[in-house]
Swiss-Prot record:
UniProt key word ATP-binding: no
UniProt xrefs under PROSITE patterns: RDRP_PHAGE
Complexes and interactors: Part of the packaging complex composed of RDRP, P4 and P7. Interacts with P7.
GO biological process: DNA-templated transcription; viral RNA genome replication
Localization: Virion
Cofactor(s), by name: Mg(2+); Mn(2+)
Protein name (record): RNA-directed RNA polymerase
InterPro entries: Cystovir_RNA-dir_pol, Cystovir_RNA-dir_pol_N, DNA/RNA_pol_sf, RNA-dir_pol_C, RNA-dir_Rpol_cat_phage
Length: 665
């Protein structure tokens, strides 16, 4: 019989213990499947027939007049377009059904993909451990920054900043006691006394665009299939149950809601999002934030990418670059790497109680909300014995660093194996592995990378490895063999990196390539957003997009270098006029004025003031979409006064005491 993860319905005491006896927590425990139109712009719903007509006309016109310019190696040239413009043809607010149940174990998934269950050589073992040492040594304390509007999740589900600071400060004080309880196997005590442990809270977020093609033979639009797991498949890790394509058919909306859906529009893709228990995350974040500061400073060449010019200066030194694509990064993330990281942290002298907290955070059960109507509200795994292998949970306090550690070394191993075996002699033991990796991350070797977790471009200078680099590129293009033992890696068709397109000229050489904004993203962000503007929420800090109008001010800086930027704006203007009988430019200028005024009022209440003229394009991007502070920019990239608008935290004095208790003396 296959191993089954224990599962507990909400009626079971195991699940009930995860939710405090307050209104928000009890509502979260029973949160039902919800769908409905979002407010794309103030007063304009995503299902408005005029808006759908506009998206229909615009997506067809742009695809017809500006076809993708991508060569057989996935490199973008010419007009800077990497794919068609049909991605906006979604009924925003209405998801595919069902979403996936998260796998309780990814061991079979990795085995089926022929991925290794540990380092395949002593060299690789040394490199993974060297990465831990370089990232987690010589850390300097920083304030513990907490995102405004975020939830503490299990068990209290509070959004109040004062409450979050209280939880964080208490967690730093009690972390050692909780960690020692976990070392004794007393996970229930650690949770009941200090709320450290419990489970991840799984919700489903919309991915408001997805791949859509037009079949030239039938004239029908086709949306990319998204495979989802049913409950049985999830609890057995794929040993039983079903994996099948979710339905994106939007025709159901007519019968259910009376919405007329134009031909070729689809329901949105949905992905799992896991909120971590904040009391457990806070002690992890207090270490993770100094790690980020260190690698974004010392290893900025590899890990910190600000302006396009900054990225171009790195790439222009290369003779070859390859944009990579990684399949299912979070669900493939290996548990053996967690064990290796924890082992090496102990070798370094990290406090065992903190390492146990960290390890537990990567093995927690998951409470699944509502993947479909009449489904969910179930706890997978036992909080008394956390042992799931779900991969990398998006709500873990150092999730970005875990992705960075895995993928940076995975990319390096791939480069060494296929292009630079002559460098292996420099990796003999831990000191030499650390020296080599330090040099590599600083961009001093003939093989290089710029990366942020699974988003990366690999590079080769004019050294001996270049010939092998071209062979690897051919291997990736053919797609017959996975070049990595650790993750499924291919080349990216339409090379993009952190939202920008690497645009080649006729020479197809990195030295003459430039980064330009992804024009598809510009359109999707405006007309197929993940979240509505929530105009009914008076407190801007509680909105998903507090100042969406500001995106208009930064649009030219962000996307203006794309060769067809002006043509696209003209097409938008014409199609908008056809649908609404008014100017889109005037509409957005008015929206910008209103949000600029609201911003000045909001920031005036903070410690410092700022006018629009003082804000950088990055500030404007982050204010329009604060999520970019999590995946694209860092605290150092954003003006201090704007950071105060979005974040608050625990003083450096308190985090310093905590960090000193955790790190080697």
């Amino acid at each position: 019989m296959p191993r089954r993860a224990p599962a507990f319905p909400l009626s079971d005491i195991k699940a009930q213990m995860l939710f405090a006896n307050n209104i928000k927590a009890q509502q979260a425990s029973k949160r039902s499947f919800k769908e409905g139109a979002i407010e794309t712009y103030e007063g304009l719903l995503s299902v408005d027939p005029r808006f759908l007509s506009f998206k229909n006309e615009l997506s067809r016109y742009l695809t017809d007049h500006f076809p993708a310019n991508v060569d057989e190696y996935g490199r973008v040239y010419g007009n800077g377009v990497r794919t068609n413009f049909f991605g906006m043809r979604h009924m925003n607010g209405f998801p595919m059904i069902p979403a996936t149940w998260p796998l309780a174990s990814n061991l079979k998934k990795r085995a089926d993909a022929d991925l290794a269950d540990g380092p395949v050589s002593e060299r690789d073992n040394l490199l993974f451990r060297a990465a831990v040492r370089l990232m987690f040594s010589d850390l300097e304390p920083v304030p513990l920054k907490i995102r405004k509007g975020s939830s503490t999740c299990i068990p209290y589900f509070s959004n109040d900043m004062g409450t979050k600071i209280e939880i964080a400060e208490r967690a730093l004080e009690k972390a050692e006691e909780a960690g020692n309880l976990m070392l004794q196997g007393k996970f229930d005590d650690a949770y009941q006394l200090h709320q450290m442990g419990g489970a991840y809270y799984v919700v489903y977020r919309a991915q408001s665009t997805d791949a859509i093609t037009l079949d030239p033979k039938t004239g029908k639009f086709v949306s990319k299939d998204r495979m989802v797991a049913d409950f049985e498949y999830a609890v057995t890790g794929g040993e039983q149950g079903s994996l099948f394509a979710a339905s994106k058919d939007a025709s159901r909306l007519k019968e259910q809601y009376g919405i007329d859906v134009p031909d070729g529009f689809f329901c949105e893709r949905r992905r799992t999002a896991m909120g971590g228990p904040f009391a457990l995350n806070a002690p992890i974040m207090a270490v993770a934030q100094p790690v980020r500061n260190k690698i974004y400073s010392k290893y900025a060449y590899t890990f910190h990418h600000t302006t396009r010019l900054n990225k171009e200066e790195k790439v222009k030194e290369w003779s070859l670059c390859v944009a990579t694509d990684v399949s299912d990064h979070d669900t493939f993330w290996p548990g053996w790497l967690r064990d290796l990281i924890c082992d090496e942290l102990l070798n370094m002298g990290y406090a065992p109680w903190w390492v146990k907290l960290f390890e537990t955070s990567l093995k927690l059960p998951v409470y699944v909300g509502a993947p479909a109507p009449e489904q969910g509200h179930t706890l997978l795994g036992d909080p008394s014995n956390p042992d799931l292998e779900v991969g990398l949970s998006s709500g873990q306090g150092a999730t970005d660093l875990m992705g960075t550690l895995l993928m940076s070394i995975t990319y390096l191993v791939m480069q060494l194996d296929h292009t630079a075996p002559h460098l292996n002699s420099r990796i003999k033991d831990m000191p030499s592995a650390c020296r080599f990796l330090d040099s590599y991350w600083q961009g001093h070797e003939e093989i290089r990378q710029i990366s942020k977790s699974d988003d990366a471009i690999l590079g080769w200078t004019k050294g001996r490895a270049l010939v092998g680099g071209h062979r690897l590129f051919e291997m990736l293009k053919e797609g017959k063999v996975n070049p990595s033992p650790y993750m499924k890696i291919s080349y990216e068709h339409g090379g993009a990196f952190l939202g920008d397109i690497l645009l080649y000229d006729s020479r197809r050489e990195p030295g003459s390539a430039i980064f330009v904004g992804n024009i598809n993203s510009m359109l999707n962000n405006q007309f197929s957003p993940e979240y509505g503007v929530q105009s009914g929420v008076r407190d801007r800090s509680k909105r998903k997009r507090p100042f969406p109008g500001l995106a208009w001010a930064s649009m030219k800086d962000t996307y203006g270098a794309c060769p067809i930027y002006s043509d696209v704006l003209e097409a938008i203007e014409r199609c908008w006029w056809n649908a609404f009988g008014e100017s889109y430019r005037a509409y957005r200028e008015d929206m910008l004025k209103r949000d600029t005024l609201e911003l000045s009022r909001y920031v005036a209440s903070m410690a410092r003031q700022a006018g629009l003229a003082e804000l950088t394009p990055i500030d404007l991007e982050v204010l329009a979409d604060p999520n970019k502070l999590q995946y694209k920019w860092t605290e150092a990239d954003v003006s201090a006064n704007i950071h105060e608008v979005l974040m608050h935290g625990v003083s450096v004095e308190k985090t310093e005491r905590f960090l000193r208790s955790v790190m080697p003396r």
